[in-house]
Amino acid sequence: MTELFRHSKHLLASLALLSVLGLMLAMHPSPSAIERIMARGELVVLTRPSNTTYYEDQHGFTGMEYELAKGFADSQGVELRILESDDLSYIRYAIRKGTADIVAAGLIATPERSKSLRFSTAYQNVDVLLVRRLTSHRITDLSQLNQQTIAVSAGSSHAELLLKAQLESPELEFQEVENATPEQLLALVEDGQVDYTLINSNSYTLQRALWPDLVADYTVARDMPLSWAFNPKDDKSLYQEAQRYLTQAKADGTTAKLEDRFYGHVEQFNLYAARSFMRHLDDRLPLYEDLFKQAEEDSGFDWRLLAALAYQESLWDPQAISPTGVKGLMMLTNNTARQMGISDRTDPSQSIRAGAGYLRRTHARIPDRIPEPSRTWMALAAYNVGYGHLEDARVLTQRQGGNPDNWQDVKQRLPLLAKPAYADQLRYGTAPGGQAVAYVRHIRRYYDLLVWAENSRRRDDTLIALN
């Protein structure tokens, strides 16, 4: 009886202790997901390096996903830390294990993925395109792909689309390639290892000129939502904050401005121009690459930006000459050559050095309060149309209620300089401002292509073996 009484006392004491602990936990609950982020002072975002998400250019890290994630981190008053992976399986594992707070990797929110991940509202919608060689058979329906070789990245939304298509066309077969990037899959098609692959329309838009022998003329799926992914086991505090941010970003034009920044300079595809660029990338650029890299050290500009400028000016032809007398790789005037202290405009070394130096001098005149990349795009416009005319465009931008320190606003006013009704009210008069806008757009396009041609090392490193 005494022993039973002793056990009862222990049981009552344990129950009392548990009650106290329960009360303490109720009074001091575990911090929420957003509170944990605020406490550590950083937001951890997992992404895939690509031209549509996250990459490095002359101004540092950038990309549509990166800029959105950076904006969200800033809105919460915390630092942004980026983790990278090309492995879709690891990405899903990492978010569920808490390795990252958010996945911002250009993921399409599919019904299958939504079973294991919590997705935000879409920040962008894309089409899924079927890519083939120009010499391959054009299809009008997926059922026509029977007996054709198709490769997609393993575990991707593209694989899900093809699995769904198999329900209606059981003979449709495809291969899933582990951790394959879009560039690797495009290389497989170009080299004839497979007949087709799938690609998101935003990715194809940015790199189409790198693959002039490929075409995407069949749409597999339309308006697929690109979304951020969250751990469904977490409370919804972080998710709700992200939802508010993305909704506001759409409402206040932030998302639209980012789309214009990353896609607005991509002009209509020109097959001849693309093939010429790829040919010159192989047979001309290597002759001058070291000179551009030396100019980078001297000027501080990314050598690929200088190379893009030179391609716009001369197609990397040191003997190029215009009807107005400008000549050389950087197409310098006699006056500019004298200013920069060179004697032979057709000498590649002198021309590149002088062109880079002149761009640096022009860039230094742009007010340093103007953030990048707007400051560089304005410097390029001034390089083309003259600094005074650029300043006129900025004055006009301010008069019309725009931001004179933002390239997106200024480029809308530059074409107005050609109209006397506007130019007569400005200091420097009329100018071909629309030409300057096109000039900057072309250079940005060539620069993007050079960055991605190098980053993906498509010539040697993107060819992968199929299982």
UniProtKB/Swiss-Prot annotation:
Lineage: Bacteria, Pseudomonadati, Pseudomonadota, Gammaproteobacteria, Oceanospirillales
Domain of life: Bacteria
Enzyme class: lyase
Region (Non-LT domain): 34-266
Principal location class: membrane
Pfam families: SBP_bac_3, SLT
Family the UniProt entry places it in: In the N-terminal section; belongs to the bacterial solute-binding protein 3 family.
Organism: Alcanivorax borkumensis (strain ATCC 700651 / DSM 11573 / NCIMB 13689 / SK2)
InterPro entries, per database record: Lysozyme-like_dom_sf, MltF, Solute-binding_3/MltF_N, Transglyc_AS, Transglycosylase_SLT_dom_1
Protein name listed in UniProt: Membrane-bound lytic murein transglycosylase F
Signal peptide: 1-33
Presence of keyword Nucleus: no
Region LT domain, annotated ranges: 268-467
Functional description taken from the UniProt entry: Murein-degrading enzyme that degrades murein glycan strands and insoluble, high-molecular weight murein sacculi, with the concomitant formation of a 1,6-anhydromuramoyl product. Lytic transglycosylases (LTs) play an integral role in the metabolism of the peptidoglycan (PG) sacculus. Their lytic action creates space within the PG sacculus to allow for its expansion as well as for the insertion of various structures such as secretion systems and flagella.
